[in-house]
Amino acid sequence: MRPSGRQPDQLRPVTLTRKFTRHAEGSVLVCFGDTQVLCTASVLPKVPPHKKGSGEGWVTAEYGMLPRSTHTRSDREAARGKQSGRTQEIQRLIGRAMRTVFDLRALGEHTLHLDCDVLQADGGTRTASITGAFVAAYDAVSVMREKGQLVGDPVRDFVAAVSVGVVDGVPVLDLDYPEDSACDTDMNVVMTGSGGFVEVQGTAEGTPFSRAEMDAMLGLADQGIRTLISLQKQALGL
């Protein structure tokens, strides 16, 4: 039995609360159990230098954790004067995941800027960020459509993410913090609604994992992401 009482193939309770803040074109509070992330999507009338004059837009992301989102307070990265390698890795992952399912040409020369701020961390903050950021981006695109800012429909597919791992020799879905800190293997999987893999990040924590365990973890991730995409569609009224 897992510490949370869940079955190996069971997600934590997941909620996606849209229009959580007032000013951003898209905003979502995403909760995976006790992990809470505020995802906002802003539409900017400009693109990075490498996209200027191309007729294409851009999708990018920033990620951060509030000082007391974890058990002990950590300094703000702004106070330290630089982002950690972990932060940079996660925000690049979020941006890559979004660009996989957006047609940049249909955005015109606009940037969708996603901000993912962790309010409370209990494992899986990067996967929750991706899952919530897509819904925020979808809402931002709807605002662009209403304003006549789009060249076409930029949303090509849905995208979501989940963590999987091996804990005490058992492959499990959606690790919380106690499991994440004690697991034999930790893997983050990003997939599209059509079943394509966007990213697979897997690391053994001391004990190598077998091909059978990897296949089992990917199977759990596929199942979990299908459920998450259904929840995204439900939240969007689709």
UniProtKB/Swiss-Prot annotation:
Its EC number is 2.7.7.56. Residues 66-88 are annotated as: Disordered. It comes from the Bacteria. InterPro entries: ExoRNase_PH_dom1 (IPR001247), ExoRNase_PH_dom2 (IPR015847), ExoRNase_PH_dom2_sf (IPR036345), PNPase/RNase_PH_dom_sf (IPR027408), Ribosomal_Su5_D2-typ_SF (IPR020568), RNase_PH (IPR050080), RNase_PH_bac-type (IPR002381), RNase_PH_CS (IPR018336). Keywords: Nucleotidyltransferase, RNA-binding, rRNA processing, Transferase, tRNA processing, tRNA-binding. It catalyses: tRNA(n+1) + phosphate = tRNA(n) + a ribonucleoside 5'-diphosphate. GO terms for biological process: rRNA catabolic process; rRNA processing; tRNA processing. One of its GO terms (molecular function) is 3'-5'-RNA exonuclease activity. Phosphate binds at residues 86, 124-126. Belongs to the RNase PH family. Phosphorolytic 3'-5' exoribonuclease that plays an important role in tRNA 3'-end maturation. Removes nucleotide residues following the 3'-CCA terminus of tRNAs; can also add nucleotides to the ends of RNA molecules by using nucleoside diphosphates as substrates, but this may not be physiologically important. Probably plays a role in initiation of 16S rRNA degradation (leading to ribosome degradation) during starvation. NCBIfam families: RNasePH. Homohexameric ring arranged as a trimer of dimers. This is Ribonuclease PH. It comes from Ralstonia pickettii (strain 12J). The lineage of its organism: Bacteria, Pseudomonadati, Pseudomonadota, Betaproteobacteria, Burkholderiales.
